[in-house]
Amino acid sequence: AKPIHAGMGRESIHVGVAGNGQAAKICNNVLTGIHIAAASESLALGQRLGLDLNVLHDIIGKGSGGSWVMERYCPKGGILENAPSSNDYKPGFTNALMAKDVGLFQQTAQTEGLPTPLASAARSMYQLAINNGLGDRDCSIIFEMIGGKND
């Protein structure tokens, strides 16, 4: 399977038996979805409080709030040149796909008897984006949806 997987991403990691790859994918994507939602809220509040978001982004990146999302996928446009937010939210990963993956995570967790309140909150945000006609836009557009402004 390695030759097939080699073209799918930068790195292929063997995770065991059939089905484990899907399990790892939804566990990873739910974290990304929650991080994007949290980063969007944090940056939107920082903006409302009058903070320079480039400075806030730098502080978060060097502090305990740093994450892949803030390093490579910042939901506020103009901070990271190659992020979807800096390119009119042209999709890297759509709201529809994020809602689907977070939903699969929730279904799987429910089957295992695991509560998922953070995943539920994040999925609600992505579903709201879909309901507002933004299903085909990048999932980081929730920054604007919750009131953040891109100048």
Task: Identify the meaning behind each predicted range.
Residues 1-33:
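Rossmann-fold dinucleotide-binding core
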Residues 20-121, 125-149:
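Helical "substrate-binding/catalytic lid" subdomain
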